């Protein structure tokens, strides 16, 4: 599975690989995205309270403005998929483009790092387990 997650006392962060969810440069979900999205939906259904934050992320290829739009469109596509499956929640969407990399887009010598860029192309879902943080 291309889905990974971490859980704290307050929330669960789910990471989904954009390469599994979307074709290159597209914001339409691929059919093979269903399995990972279903797992994420199950977590939201079981644990979700309050706001569900969906953020899209890209690698560093392309302009900042373009990547921001693409990442937001991808977050919207994931939200639409959840809602089509009857998962009505208070969703908050963000398109962060290439501003929050989790891996280097280039090697130390400045050459391209395809593996790092692949990790950065992702959709993150933050599932709040409590309606108010700090409770």
Where are these regions (language model features)?
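Periplasmic peptidoglycan-binding/tethering modules of Gram-negative envelope proteins
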Residues: 1-51, 129-135
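Periplasmic OmpA-like peptidoglycan-binding domain that tethers envelope proteins to the cell wall
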Residues: 55-135
